[in-house]
Amino acid sequence: MTISYSGNVIRILLRWKGSIWRTAWKELLIYLILYYSVRVFYLKGIDLIDDDEDDRLKMRRMFETFCRQCDSYTRLIPLTFLLGFYVSNVVARWWRQFETLYWPEDILSVLCTVLHQHDEKSKRRRHTIARYLNLANALAWRDISSKIRLRFPSVHSLIESGLLTEKEYQILEAMHAENESSRWITPLHWIQLIMRQVEEEHKPTASLFNQFVGELRIFRQSLRKLYSYDWVCVPLVYTQVAALATYSFFFFTLFGRQPLFPDIETGKELDLVVPVFTIVQFLFFVGWFKVGQDLMRPFGLDDDDIELNYILDRNVRISFAIVNQLQESPIPDFESNDDKLWHEMHPPTKDGETSPIPRIPQLPHSKYSKQLSEHPPRLHAYVPIDDGKGSIKDLESHHGCVSLKKDKKHISW
């Protein structure tokens, strides 16, 4: 599931699961090994290549020139622009896929209004429709989510979960043999057939029935959009450009960020054994790029991937609670004398009747929320003006929000 976090900055930075440390530590380790390999070559390796002092000095100067060129090359790569545009598109795409997920409360609430009878057949119909909705989700999500696929490795495994019966499984397999794309659509079509029977038997209100059909269409569209997101990924060339820019930038820093003897001797540079700024920069940019890589497939196995297993379990519980428990439970007695707000809004008069003008009740505060209510929000979009007598009056109470005298200083909006 996407990692939830709260607290101060120190606690957030020390988190491991779903953090930048877990994402980029392997790349950082490889980078530091290569960096210190180049450093050892510059400090000790050149002296071991040739015994001639002049040749070693010439080779060292050539290496220093190459390092300076690499440092200048890093300024030519617009890494911030490329990564910013790339990651912003990937994160927006990731969030749109989460928003595409359909929650069953809306369609089942309409169902309980259309099919509100309490006979056994109506109960079974509501229960079956709720099961078919979750079955369609499970069939579609197992095609796009690695976690759902691991939970239900085959369609037959849905029988053990209770979402599918053996007879329905045979129908689904027969349909799948003829058309591979019809498996997840079939339960939604069964819902339409059930509602057609309900329409013929109970004659529900046309507006409510049309609303249910509209919610079912939105449900179908959400699954189709998820398939589309899974089929059509971010263009490969876009990812390649971002990857090439990121890793080539830090390849050049392997040489360009080396402390050189001439700069150290003249005091232009300090010989920091640990390249602190380069490490921080590496974590920034590589972690930034890894965010785009990890969020490319939001239904995978990474820490920040959307947990469809939890959502499926939650939808199953909510669905059957709506069509069974909530629909069959009696309505609370609202005509009793337990409604405190009703008595506050309609206090009895002297003749025993309720007041014709209701009062607006004030909800009480606890001792913890009392201090928060002492500073209510207020409007600041008004212009005070001088009425010529030395007093300040509000613009709205005297002139409205449209006109002011031309000889007055005012703010127009």
Swiss-Prot record:
GO terms for cellular component: chloride channel complex; plasma membrane. The chain crosses the membrane at residues 29-49, 72-92, 236-256, 272-292. Disulfide bonds: none annotated. It comes from the Eukaryota. Its main location: membrane. It is found in: Cell membrane. It is a multi-pass membrane protein. One of its GO terms (molecular function) is chloride channel activity. Forms chloride channels. This is Bestrophin homolog 13.
